[in-house]
């Protein structure tokens, strides 16, 4: 009988690698804020504007253990047909992931990594809207697990159609 745990991962010298996730860097790749109607759009309003938020996550390998995970947040505030502001943030992180079985890599990259990046990206968006003359936009927490499941279902449906 073997004493080895199922799914055990070995490092290059044959020793068992301890599972680890480290953030090597975080960075703003792109940040834009537009307020096309300013200063008129800054006046007090009787009702809150409609705010649409889009979120996207991408991950790319940099090496065998390092991955670039990019969180894109787009927010647009509209009052009737007037665009009050439009902001976009592309925020990335370089993650070193070791000792994780391959079958757990996608959930780690598309759920846990963006979950770690989100509070920083949220603060940048809040600061940008506040500095633009509006109340800070505090984006609600995002369910990255649900986003990942939806993404996997869409990819599965696409591959089923191609078959």
Swiss-Prot record:
Where does the record place it?
A: Cytoplasm
Gene Ontology BP term (one): protein folding
Cite a single GO MF annotation.
unfolded protein binding
| PANTHER family in the cross-refs | PROTEIN-EXPORT PROTEIN SECB (PTHR36918:SF1), PTHR36918
What assembly does the database describe for this protein?
Homotetramer, a dimer of dimers. One homotetramer interacts with 1 SecA dimer.
What this chain does, per the record? One of the proteins required for the normal export of preproteins out of the cell cytoplasm. It is a molecular chaperone that binds to a subset of precursor proteins, maintaining them in a translocation-competent state. It also specifically binds to its receptor SecA.
Give the protein name, as stated in the record.
Protein-export protein SecB
Which terms are listed as keywords in the entry?
Answer: Chaperone, Cytoplasm, Protein transport, Translocation, Transport
Name the species this protein comes from.
Brucella anthropi (strain ATCC 49188 / DSM 6882 / CCUG 24695 / JCM 21032 / LMG 3331 / NBRC 15819 / NCTC 12168 / Alc 37) (Ochrobactrum anthropi)
Record-level GO cellular component terms: cytoplasm
Q: Which family does it belong to?
A: Belongs to the SecB family.
């Amino acid at each position: 009988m073997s004493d080895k745990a199922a799914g055990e991962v070995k490092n290059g010298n044959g020793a068992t690698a301890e599972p680890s996730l480290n953030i090597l860097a975080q960075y703003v790749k792109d940040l834009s804020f537009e307020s096309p109607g300013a200063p008129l759009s800054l006046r007090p309003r009787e009702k809150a504007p409609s705010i649409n938020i889009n979120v996207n996550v991408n991950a790319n390998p940099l090496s065998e253990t390092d991955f670039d995970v990019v969180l894109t947040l787009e927010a647009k505030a509209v009052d009737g047909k007037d665009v009050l502001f439009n902001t976009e943030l592309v925020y990335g992180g370089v993650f070193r992931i070791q000792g994780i079985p391959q079958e757990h890599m996608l959930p780690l990259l598309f759920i846990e990594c963006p979950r770690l990046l989100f509070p920083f990206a949220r603060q940048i968006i809040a600061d940008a809207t506040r500095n633009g003359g509006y109340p800070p936009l505090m984006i609600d927490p995002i369910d990255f697990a649900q986003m990942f499941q939806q993404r996997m279902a869409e990819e599965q449906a696409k591959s089923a159609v191609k078959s």
